[in-house]
Amino acid sequence: LPLIEDAAQAFGATWRGARIGTFGALAAFSLQQGKHITTGEGGIVATDDDALARRLFLFVNKAWGYGDPKPDHYFPAPNYRLTELQGAVALAQLPKLDQVVAARRD
């Protein structure tokens, strides 16, 4: 049974010396406005499994296989892509993550 981690508010957290988001097959982090890193809404799913990563990419992208020789909608799926602006906003906050976590702990 694969483990899916709900790591919504766990950016930077550790358990028994390992970072949260590294235990399961998938880990979901939230970017909603009250979280450690925010883009207003949305989230990030992390995995180190190439097959799952491909399935996730297709799922959040209406199952449209961009870059495939014959792109098609492979299965019914929504559009959950972050915008490029949301991605840039999230990336700009990463260097400040340790400070944000420390401030929340105080």
Kindly give the residue locations of the regions a language model identified:
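A short helix->loop->beta-strand "cap" motif at the edges of active sites that frequently abuts
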Residues: L1
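Glycine-centered flexible beta-alpha turn that most often forms the glycine-rich phosphate-binding loop
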Residues: D6
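Active-site region of PLP-dependent enzymes
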Residues: A10-R16, F23-D106
